[in-house]
């Protein structure tokens, strides 16, 4: 496959999807992945509340970059029954897709709860909100606009597509479940289940009717406590929607540092692979970061290994993530004054 064929394939796969139900946003940092796909599992964090921001930039080596940004907030609420906690939060994702100038805004809220029984934690969550899509077709070219005389695309030629509108919005509903279990001193394991787009809303810029297919995701994760300073965290996240799929698997190494000898508390390094049904590895993901006080700062880089590697020169995308976790407040000891006689 030569360079021009690779670029053409990229255009068909990404820009063409703007007219149907565009490919869902995906993240390389495992925390951002859960914030988007399973807030039930994401609610297992140790703390009172959590806020996160992430920024992803990809395909800059081929065309106008695809940019995805997200803001996330999750807050826990205590009940009289200490085994039960409620949680609620917000998620905003904006995805801007290259030359098609397709902008997707997700405004989502979630509510749910967690229940602790012995060494088990169970969580359930409902996520709902509005998804808005806007398309600017001024810079978009279709296969029918290829001009053989010039060897390029001509926007003045008919594209063969009838746009009904350049903006749309719909209500979205997602459900997620989570389970976590402290098996022994060495192992903690967990799993999650996600069902997305339950309403299968209409979302097409064309005159045709195209429903968003329902998506189902499964998450498997664990923590192996090597010793008091080192942990290994393997994951396997799988998500499938109609004929598309995304499987993310790999492992993260986390190491605690002596707080008196370093300006941060710990660092972590991870390596992951992203694959799809019937294809080889789509991308190799290398990531890492540090934790200091209540902050977790991380970055991940995608090395493109798909059929588009010739056009992209193996450069996929880079993602930056910042998480703040509000710690559990400890009770202050109050000295009760007494009178002296």
Task: Locate each region found by the language model.
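N-terminal, post-signal peptide beta-strand-biased segments of exported outer-membrane/organellar beta-barrel
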Residues: 20-87, 322-324
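Outer-membrane pore/translocation modules
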Residues: 31, 114-225, 234, 330, ...
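Membrane-embedded beta-strand positions of outer-membrane beta-barrel proteins
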Residues: 39, 51-53, 88-90, 111, ...
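Short loop/turn motifs that connect adjacent beta-strands in outer-membrane beta-barrel proteins
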Residues: 41-48, 78-85, 99, 116-122, ...
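Transmembrane beta-strands of outer-membrane beta-barrel pores
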Residues: 55-59, 75-77, 92-96, 128-134, ...
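Outer membrane beta-barrel transmembrane domains
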Residues: 209-210, 214-341
